[in-house]
Amino acid sequence: MGNGMCSRKQKRIFQTLLLLTVVFGFLYGAMLYLELQTQLRKAEAVALKYQQHQDSLSAQLQVVYEHRSRLEKSLQKERLEHKKAKEDFLVYKLEAQETLNKGRQDSNSRYSALNVQHQMLKSQHEELRKQHSDLEEEHRKQGEDFSRTFNDHKQRYLQLQQEKEQELSKLKETVYNLREENRQLRKAHQDIHTQLQDVKTQVAEYKQLKDTLNRIPSFRNPDPVEQQNVTFPHGTHPPQGYNGREKLTGELQEVQPNHEAGPRRMEEKPLSSMQKDAGFQALEEQNQVEPREPEERQVEEEHRKALEEEEMEQVGQAEHLEEEHDPSPEEQDRDWRDQQGQNAAHLLDGHPQAEVEHSTKAATNFQSPYEEQLEQQRLAARRDEEAQRLREHQEALHQQRLHGQLLRQQQQQQFLAREMAQQKQVAHEDGQQQHQEQLRQQAHYNAVENDIAQGVEDQGIPEEEGGAYDRDNQRQDEAEGDPGNRQELREPGHQEGDPEVEADRAAVEDINPADDPNNQGEDEFEEAEQVREENLPEESEEQKQSEAKQGNVEMDEHLVMAGNPDQQEDNVDEQYQDEGEEEVQEDLTEEKKREMEHNVEETYGEHPDDKNNDGEEQGVHNRAHPKGRQEHYEEEEDEEDGAAVAEKSHRRAEM
């Protein structure tokens, strides 16, 4: 029983244990099943993912294969093109070598010709220099001879001028004295003529008085006592009927006291008595004066003309003032005629007492010899005084003329001294210009020789194939991307040049090369440069097309790589690196361009005045040396060739 009980208990324990194990197994199986289900789901998801990845990889591989096939085709095409280009380049190389050999031969022949011509020009220059020195010596000698002869002629001219001035002053003095004597003689003649007219009028008056007295019956038979007691008022003369001689002597005695004031009155107004006696003359001179009037008028006109000439020729104002105070004979004749008409009118009214008074006053015109002598002495003293005044005036005029002549001589000497100084200055400036011209020509010769030697050395260097190819590519790059760099390189070259050289070069460029006989082969080089400039745009277009093709290939590669994420990440990194490098290069190129533009602006901003000054110097040089253009033309050609060779060497150094 005990065993039965134990067995039952053990059986239950065993059953419970078994049940527990079954339950735990079931639970473990369920959990395992769930875990397996989750792993299965994960595996299915991974399988789907890998399936998708496999599909994408297959698609990418297909695209890669297609792109590879296209790349192989393009590579084959590029190989073919490269072969063709290589063949073309070989042909071009051969042709270029042939043309280079021809150019070398031409340049050598031209250099030999230019060397021969240079030697000829040197010999001509030496000959011209000798001729110039001889001409300068001759010019100096001729200048000395000219200055010597000029000084001799000048001294002789001044001496002759002084002699002629002295002779002229003497002649003027003699002419003036002769005219003064003529004027005085004419005055004396006029005085004598007026005295003669007065005497004639007195004779006519006496005749008239005689006739009137004869007509009066009371005076025909007068008593002797009455005849003795008859007196005439104002000293008038009795008629000739009574004791003619005694009465005439009495008349003369009565006339003499009134004669003292006569000469002074004759000096101041010689015709004053004629004015008073005009009444007595009016009746008689109606018959007598009329035939004399034409002669008197002629004499008066001649006298008036002579006086006008004398007045025009007289120098100084003192003589004019003195003559203005004295009445001229024309004025006296005019006054006499006016008063003659007035007195004739008075005579028509009748004035017997005036007739007697005028007759007595007319008698005062008779002068004694003593009074005439005194009058002549006074006239001589007056003439001496006038002659003294004339001499003093002539001496003053002579001194004034000598002073003016000395001033003129001083002015002429100063003018001649200024002219000589200007001539010396001009000769000095010409000598300096000639010396500068000689130095400049020597510098030109030296520069031309150096350029020619450098050109020969540069042409003698053999060029390699790769170097020629690199130079062509570099020339294309410069033609496409950097056109301003060449301009910048050329502009400093022009700026460093001498302005005189630029002026000569511009003067040479003004000459038409086609008209120049010395132009040997210049047109060939110009045509070659034009062909090269025309080929540069074509080469730049071809390079642009090749760059466009490369851009298209890069875009295709970018599209192909877009499908693969790993490759895409690698491509993104490479793209970032490439973009960074491109940005750095673009920044560098932009900075270079800015610096170039800034330099160009500075050159254009700094040197417009220099260019204008060069243009002005060029105009002055062209005006000053129009004949020197042909002489320097060949030298300028050599300089241009040397500049081209220097530019080529500079490009090689840059490459």
From Swiss-Prot:
Residue numbers carrying Phosphoserine: 328, 540
Endosome targeting as annotated region, ranges: 80-175
Lipidation (N-myristoyl glycine): 2
Segments on the Lumenal face: 34-655
PTM sites of type Phosphotyrosine: 576, 633
Domain of life: Eukaryota
Keyword set, alphabetical order: Coiled coil, Endosome, Glycoprotein, Golgi apparatus, Lipoprotein, Membrane, Myristate, Phosphoprotein, Signal-anchor, Transmembrane, Transmembrane helix, Transport
Record field: compositional bias (Basic and acidic residues): 123-145, 261-270, 290-307, 319-328, 348-360, 381-398, 468-508, 590-620
Golgi targeting, as annotated region: 38-107, 176-220
Record: glycosylation sites: 229
Keyword Cell membrane: no
Post-translational modification: Phosphorylated by c-AMP-dependent kinases most probably in its lumenal part.
An example Gene Ontology CC term for this record: Golgi apparatus
Record topology, Cytoplasmic segments: 2-12
Residue ranges, compositional bias (Acidic residues): 567-589, 633-642
Phosphothreonine modification, residue list: 589
Compartments where located: Golgi apparatus, Golgi stack membrane; Endosome membrane; Membrane
Topology of this chain in the membrane: Single-pass type II membrane protein; Lipid-anchor
Transmembrane annotation, as ranges: 13-33
Coiled coil: 66-216
Annotated Low complexity bias: 399-423, 433-442
Residue stretches of biased makeup (Polar residues): 361-370
Family: Belongs to the GOLIM4 family.
Name used for this protein in its record: Golgi integral membrane protein 4
Source taxonomy: Eukaryota, Metazoa, Chordata, Craniata, Vertebrata
